[in-house]
Amino acid sequence: HQIRDIRELENKRNTIIKDLYVVGNPYLDELSKMKETIIKENNNKKTILIAPSWGMNCLFRRFGEKLLDNIVNSDYNIIIRPHPQSLISDKDIIDKFQNRYKYKNNVEWDFNRVNIYSLSKADIMISDFSGVIFDYAFLFEKPVIIPSFTFDKRGTDAIEIDEEVWTFETIPKISFKLDENNFSNISQIIEDSINNETLKNNILKAKEEAYMYEGQASKRAAQFLNDMLITINN
């Protein structure tokens, strides 16, 4: 799905046309291997993973406690996993929420470098536009809840693309859109999203489009580079 956008940017920027070869996703392949080694915990309560991106568009800054209080005060286990860059760029707001929820026994903060452990515990994820959405959807085939907002594309390649980029076109299809006026109903929305067959089918379709050659990426990449070297040397 990235090839279309790359070709458009090359044309608009008058840059060299690149050789593009789809190898798969070595990052997801490695996470998938790790996933198989994790022992699933038995828990009577559902676990909600809050995993936003960072910066001015992230849900911490856009919605803050108006959203988080409703989630934290629900009858769920909550894992809050900030984006690693948030510890630098959004440290003020991370400190604020750590202090705000420090006495909440159902809240766990995850600053682990690897995300797979929190992903494996979650029954559903609440995010914004973070790439972890696709890690979760493709590896666990579970839905995501995303508060409704318009992403500011300034400073990104997406602003130069005529059509909607695949990421922003796909996220609404594999997630439940949460209106700001409906934050107080988050518990019911979580239950409805977890059991939503349409979302699950859309996740499977998106996975077919974006996560090709599952488990084969490293081998395919090595073979491609080897073939390129042979071509160059000849």
Question: Can you annotate each of these PLM segments?
Answer:
Residues 9-12, 91-101, 162-164:
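Short, aromatic/basic amphipathic alpha-helical patches
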Residues 1-4, 75, 121-122, 172:
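Short, well-ordered alpha-helix to beta-strand connector turns
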Residues 14-17, 131-210:
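Catalytic binding pocket for nucleotide-activated donors in carbohydrate/polymer assembly enzymes
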